[in-house]
Curated annotation (Swiss-Prot):
Species name: Eremothecium gossypii (strain ATCC 10895 / CBS 109.51 / FGSC 9923 / NRRL Y-1056)
Cell location: Mitochondrion outer membrane
Alphabetical keyword list: Membrane, Mitochondrion, Mitochondrion outer membrane, Protein transport, Transport
Protein task: Required for the assembly of the TOM (translocase of outer membrane) receptor complex, which is responsible for the recognition and translocation of cytosolically synthesized mitochondrial preproteins.
Family membership noted in the UniProt record: Belongs to the MIM1 family.
Protein name (record): Mitochondrial import protein 1
Major localization listed first in the record, in broad terms: mitochondrion
GO cellular component, one term: mitochondrial outer membrane
Record bears the keyword Protein transport: yes
Key word Nucleus present: no
Amino acid sequence: MAEEILGNIAEEAHAALLASAGDEATKKSGAIRLPIEDSLDGDFGSRGTAYTDLSTTTSAGTSGQLVERTGGISFGRLLSVAGSCSINLLLPFLNGLMLGFGELLAHELSWKFSWFDKERNRGYRIYPEVRKAAELQERERQRALSRAAGPDGFL
């Protein structure tokens, strides 16, 4: 195990030297270099990670993968900006919607199940029109019952 690690150190140093020498050449030519694995199963052999210069790629299968930097905004950069804008602008909007609907739902449930005493809690007077009409009808019904009951409270 130790021999393999020590043997790989020399190979890694050699690969780093080749990569730095290749980086200077790509800076001058303007081409982009990408790492390519030697095999799909991850066995890299004695060469480590190989680099290929995309400006010298001539095969028909890889010519479509030629990536060159041009003036303007790249599609990846545009997606990155759109993603950060959606996080900063869209998610707070959705959060506000969820909070608002949650508050409306809690209010409706408390009204439906009479969780709070309506006689004691008179400070909160914001109701939809339908509920205002229902409350007025309930008051009229209570007044009619109290008038019919008489002064002593019995029928």
